[in-house]
């Protein structure tokens, strides 16, 4: 609860009006913490369009286990698959899961776990990273090359040099990064591989290197590219066009950004520096790059600081990573709200609430507002207007003077007949632009 002045009982009439919002207010998000597997760490890696999430987390003894999270079933430990540690790296819209486990000799064993089926080993693969709906998957092959394949099919290397495939769509278009010589030269650059164009180097922003981390159905690739100043900037690359610099959150000094994922609408999420620390961002064409931290509930922020956003789906839900007070990474699902949340005003009161004539003096009146907000610790409440029951015949604009956000001077003068009533109209606005109107009254006694 936020109280601009201390308040006791509800001593004045409170009128709550409908909520309003600034037309350009960014969307707010509901936050669902994914929890843990009994350990301290849970890192999400991928999400499908149904909102199902996979990744890895520690159990009580510190061992890393693959997990699946669904809204219906919550967090599920997928086990070790016969190894000593396991990780899940991809999930498609059918619910098939891509991952790998380590045996006692720390040899990697990639697998696909079909929805409702049993694990299938993936031969010729060193580390799988992403899975498309029609079973295309990518990663690094056993000979250290980016590849694409379908389960049971041929593992097709798509670079002649050391490389990694990080993302793939249902058409088999693949994104990742590759070095340009064998043995590897100093810096890799991002690529897109398609059947029509083959291997396309996406370039940089004038620096030596770039990486690709996401691709959508249209073949739009996102990632990070080095500038000539050696600073990473998030980019979006539409097929046939140059890299689009998505910018940074903070101007002045060194500020970096990295794009991790893109949905089919072209919305991008990732990591950026804001105010000297890392945070999660979302980029859209209409709003540009925005910090997600102020858009989640205050209660969710109390769990820890947002660190990164790693996935966004067709419903614009976002998987975010945060760092808890102990420095451990945890994961949460951010679901966009259809409305703009507004403050909740429980009481408005004026002090004094009765003015005693007859000397007509101007009396200072102070307003107290009891207000709470899910997204803002301190919504701003102000007196926006005062109405006077005396009307223009008896009243005067010299009878009212707003002196501060929640203070006003009112003239203690009444006209014949009923008590004179001043109505103080209040607006409380949160950081998202959500607004609530309320009012309280001050009476000039006729006795």
Language-model segments: residues:
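Residue-level hotspots at or immediately adjacent to binding/recognition sites across diverse folds
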Residues: 24-338
